[in-house]
Swiss-Prot record:
It is a multi-pass membrane protein. The lineage of its organism: Eukaryota, Glaucocystophyceae, Cyanophoraceae, Cyanophora. The record marks 344-345 as: Cleavage. This is Photosystem II protein D1. It comes from Cyanophora paradoxa. PROSITE patterns: REACTION_CENTER. The gene is psbA. Its EC number is 1.10.3.9.
């Protein structure tokens, strides 16, 4: 009997680390993008929670009138927010070491920049990690491509818009009511509801919701029953089974008769491509619209566009919207300036459509 002895090939610590990072056998895939993603998102989340709970007021407008956003200073979950960096900081990079003290850094809204920068890099790495895992598993890369839509939207409101407006103080606050305030001010200053790219985003989000509900309900309604009436139809499905789980012919026939024949997909691949494409393209265009409005290429303006033969303005719905925009604009940053730019420059603009009659 002959025994063969073979020395095990030694694997360096670095090779073991690389194998662990890139292994698809882990319960949670890490990947090289994950090496950056996990610490970035954990750091952003940690400081967001601390700032949301305990950050002192921030001089957002740069006029020595701090605005409180944390729970410790009287806010609740709805009204609380991480307040954007001060207008006195502008677009300057403002890490902790650039401030004279921690108190100054907090007063000027340093945590906002900290959270936003780490968050944007973190979600970008998450997108890269999606691609990396798809690559390791031999899948196509469209999951990461779809995720690029919300990444683009977040980048637009947290980075591109402040760059275009010249200050991080114009970025979206990190809170519920702060988000709504950002939306109202954005409408007032850029007329976003009249921008075609925003309209495409609305069609993408609401259309995507409609198509998702239609698809899910059609599939659920055309499941191939493998069980008796006394047990759930779900019990007839086995993970990884070769047989189809629903009858696409039945779903196609139902929907084709409900609307018309060519409104229904007869190809599962083209159907799911459409379901992915519609909302993604819509949100891409919304992000693109936000990025153009950041540099004041605003929504369509039809104010005072209808006049009579004497040149007098005939008010339209566009003029009603314009009046609402002016009202929203004069309410925000009320102490930073006496009048909004639309009222402080140019010719006098009437804010009432018709003058009230006195003693009539």
């Amino acid at each position: 009997m002959t025994a063969t002895l073979e020395r095990n090939a030694s694997v360096s610590l670095w090779e073991q680390f690389c194998g662990f990072i890139t292994s698809t056998e882990n319960r949670l895939y890490i990947g090289w993008f994950g090496v950056l993603m996990f610490p970035l998102l954990l750091t952003a989340t940690t400081l967001f929670i601390i700032a949301f709970v305990a950050a002192p007021p921030v001089d957002i407008d740069g006029i020595r009138e701090p605005v409180a956003g944390s729970l410790f200073y009287g806010n609740n979950i709805i009204s609380g927010a991480v307040i954007p960096s001060s207008a006195a900081i502008g677009m300057h990079f403002y890490p902790i070491w650039e401030a004279a003290s921690l108190d100054e850094w907090l007063y000027n809204g340093g945590p906002y920049q900290f959270v936003v920068m780490h968050f944007l890099l973190g979600v970008a790495c998450y997108m890269g990690r999606e691609w990396e895992l798809s690559f390791r598993l031999g899948m196509r890369p469209w999951i990461a491509v779809a995720y690029s839509a919300p990444v683009a939207a977040a980048t637009a409101v947290f980075l591109i818009y402040p760059i275009g407006q010249g200050s991080f103080s114009d970025g979206m606050p990190l809170g519920i009511s702060g988000t709504f305030n950002f939306m109202l001010v954005f409408q007032a200053e850029h007329n976003i509801l009249m921008h075609p790219f925003h309209m495409m985003g609305v069609a993408g989000v609401f259309g995507g919701s409609l198509f998702s509900a239609m698809h899910g309900s059609l599939v659920t309604s055309s499941l191939i029953r493998e069980t008796t009436e006394n047990e759930s139809a779900n019990a007839g499905y086995k993970f990884g089974q070769e047989e189809e789980t629903y009858n696409i012919v039945a779903a196609h026939g139902y929907f084709g008769r409900l609307i018309f024949q060519y409104a229904s997909f007869n190809n599962s691949r083209s159907l799911h491509f459409f379901l992915a494409l519609w909302p993604v393209v819509g949100i891409w265009f919304t992000a693109l619209g936000l990025s153009t409005m950041a540099f004041n290429l605003n929504g369509l303006n039809f104010n005072q566009s209808v006049v009579d033969s004497q040149g007098r303005v005939i008010s339209t719905w566009a003029d009603i919207i314009n009046r609402a925009n002016l009202g929203m604009e004069v309410m925000h940053e009320r102490n930073a300036h006496n009048f909004p730019l639309d009222l402080a420059s140019g010719e006098v603009m009437p804010v009432a459509l018709t003058a009230p009659s006195i003693n009539a």
